[in-house]
């Protein structure tokens, strides 16, 4: 690559990172809006807590299955087009959800939304590994991963604003649907599948593959399956991911509800507290990626061990916090949980991509997705039942314990190498 090509590549790389971050954030806006709408839906008797918990669980499981299946296809197809279709369909499902009052249709539209949401991350994982060199991936992909937090914060902030303006829960679906439709158009025209779509040469990976990175390499489906399913590090991280997502969605899906029921904080203030959780997550995500590259030489699993430990302690601290404690104390503990839990959330995708190489990055992240979103069996209906029959104290204690279990799985993978490129080329 010439000096001129290198300069053009860096500009195009950051343009891709920014554009794909914006597009992916709108997947979250059309997913996390439900957590803000649900307190009013429950209060008005539009839906029961058990039905809502079941919908959240099935939605999450199907989302995980979708990421798994679409991970296979995203490695083969154009990521830009794949992502655009998923975002457009998510916008449609949100609009339809806002139009109905029947529980069966709530379930149908949100479950289909779970599938279309799974068309977002796998193509991004593939495209990122084609745009970013493995030696920079932890830092730059961690920056990209803040799109999760920005998207969630935008959903919470937007819905809080709509409630403050006196608009009902339906507008929490109409407005995000309209914005996501515009974002789908933006994605189609601005996100690039790889350097080739910008007229640039592909990344040279000969230094990490351990031999010439020939352009004529042929990768079969059997090769991709071997890279993913015969890698013990990917399996350990997938198991750990289950517990990462229990903690993450325990707070995201139920945060506004338990703050209202458990602490007596109204939905608007509770939404702002969860926004603080997400903003702390942005800082934590970037910090985790930076520490991984600078302190642990790209070994993201080691960063995850410490993050899960402190995330668990923060969650347990929230459980220990007495009723009537100042709201700023609860906010700080929420922010601490967000800061630490989003490190593993981002790094697991990076570790999967590094271990499976850019030949199977989408498939590996699809596998991570199905394991992570299987956690909604706990964070959805599980938390609903625990909070109903045992109270929010028991629910928060459980979330803290799950974080520490996840830490143990990461410990088993402590000695993992930073990437799987040399092993794949052997």
Task: Name every feature range the model reports, one short phrase each.
Residues 109-150:
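Cytoplasmic helix-loop-helix junction between adjacent transmembrane helices
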Residues 32, 60-68, 152-153, 278-286, ...:
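Residue-level signature of mid-helix packing/kink "hotspots" within the transmembrane helices
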Residues 358-390:
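A late C-terminal transmembrane helix in Major Facilitator Superfamily
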Residues 88-101, 309-323:
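C-terminal ends and interior cores of transmembrane alpha-helices
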Residues 65-104:
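Conserved MFS/SLC helix-loop-helix module at the cytosolic interface between two early adjacent transmembrane helices
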Residues 144-195:
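Helix-loop-helix hairpin linking two adjacent transmembrane segments in secondary transporters
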Residues 34-36, 231-286, 345, 379:
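Extracytoplasmic gate region of multi-pass secondary transporters
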Residues 76-87, 294-308:
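Cytoplasmic membrane-interface "Motif A"-like loop-to-helix N-cap segments
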């Amino acid at each position: 690559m010439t000096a001129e090509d290198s300069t053009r590549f860096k500009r195009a790389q950051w343009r891709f990172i920014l554009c794909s971050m914006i597009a992916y954030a709108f997947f979250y806006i059309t997913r996390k809006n439900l957590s803000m709408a649900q307190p009013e839906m429950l209060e008005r008797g539009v839906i029961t807590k058990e039905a809502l918990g079941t919908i959240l669980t099935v939605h999450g499981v199907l989302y995980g299955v979708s990421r798994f299946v679409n991970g296979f296809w995203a490695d083969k197809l154009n990521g830009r087009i794949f992502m655009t279709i998923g975002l457009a369909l998510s916008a449609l499902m949100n609009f339809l959800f806002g139009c109905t009052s029947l529980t069966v249709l709530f379930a149908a539209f949100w479950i289909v939304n779970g599938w279309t949401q799974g068309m977002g991350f796998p193509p991004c994982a593939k495209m990122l590994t084609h745009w970013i060199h493995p030696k920079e991936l932890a830092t730059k992909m961690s920056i990209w991963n803040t799109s999760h937090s920005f998207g969630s914060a935008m959903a919470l902030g937007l819905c809080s604003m709509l409630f403050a303006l006196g608009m009902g829960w339906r507008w929490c679906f109409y407005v995000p649907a309209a914005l996501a439709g515009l974002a789908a158009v933006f994605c189609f025209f601005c996100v690039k599948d790889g350097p080739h779509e910008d007229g640039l040469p592909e990344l040279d990976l000969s230094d990490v593959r351990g031999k010439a990175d020939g352009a004529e390499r042929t990768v079969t489906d059997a090769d991709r399956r071997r890279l993913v399913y015969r890698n013990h590090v990917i399996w350990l991280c997938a198991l750990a991911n289950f517990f990462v997502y229990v903690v993450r969605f325990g707070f995201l899906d139920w945060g506004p509800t338990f703050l209202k029921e458990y602490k007596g904080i109204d939905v608007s203030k509770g939404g702002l507290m969860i926004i603080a959780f997400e903003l702390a997550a942005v800082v934590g995500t970037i910090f985790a990626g930076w520490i991984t590259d600078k302190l642990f030489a790209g070994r993201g699993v080691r960063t995850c061990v410490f993050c899960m430990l402190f995330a668990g302690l923060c969650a347990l601290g929230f459980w220990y916090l007495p009723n009537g404690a100042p709201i700023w104390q609860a906010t700080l503990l929420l922010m601490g949980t967000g800061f630490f839990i989003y490190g593993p959330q981002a790094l697991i995708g990076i570790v999967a991509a590094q271990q499976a190489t850019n030949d199977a990055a989408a498939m590996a992240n699809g596998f991570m997705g199905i394991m992570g979103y299987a956690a909604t069996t706990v964070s959805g209906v599980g938390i609903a039942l625990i909070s109903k029959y045992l109270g929010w104290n028991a629910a928060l204690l459980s979330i803290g314990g799950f974080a520490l279990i996840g830490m143990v799985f990461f410990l088993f993978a402590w000695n993992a190498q930073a990437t799987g490129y040399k092993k794949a080329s052997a």
